Amino acid sequence: MYHDGEDYALARCDLSTGQFAACAFQGEGAQAKLLNQLSAWLPSEAILSPGAESQEEVTAFLRDRLDCLCQPGQDGPFRTDRARKALISCGLWLEEEPLPPEGSRKLLGFRAAGALADYLAQTQKTDLSHLGPLVLEEEPEGQYMELDLTARRNLELTETLRNQEKRGSLLWVLDRTRTAMGHRMIRAWIERPLRAPGRITRRQDAVGTP
């Protein structure tokens, strides 16, 4: 996690599947959006830049609400040049590929992703060639419904409130996918509900039925 001024950036990786994604939030309301995103991702471990570690509300949320292990990081891996080097080394970025525009949310996410790649390269004693592709998320504001941790738990989107199990949750009811990739996709859809009617309709039209 990276923090600078009013801006935040997050990157996440699932080592078992190779999924690697990053997103960023800028300006007013950025911290609230960050907490909502953390509620969706439910990280078990977080690497914090010095700026992020200084945000007591964020670190308390990670430790107390999400039971997440917080590890202090250095500013160096979050620099654009070092982030690019780490991503190229892990096969997540092509050497000839241009950087995201300066000042953009994508560049913030790029820096967070690079710092995570740098951390994994140093700590994981295994081949990382299965990681990727890197997804730099930059959706228009208001595209998704904002749900905080309490709302997510009360709605039992992906696990039940009582037993923290999939069975009985909305995901359990809707998931008729036949592949691991399909399961991950429908889970991601449920965790980030769309708001635009047109996009909702297109998504419904794209779903096949048995």
State the predicted function of each range.
Residues M1-P210:
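Charged catalytic and DNA/RNA-contacting regions of genome-maintenance
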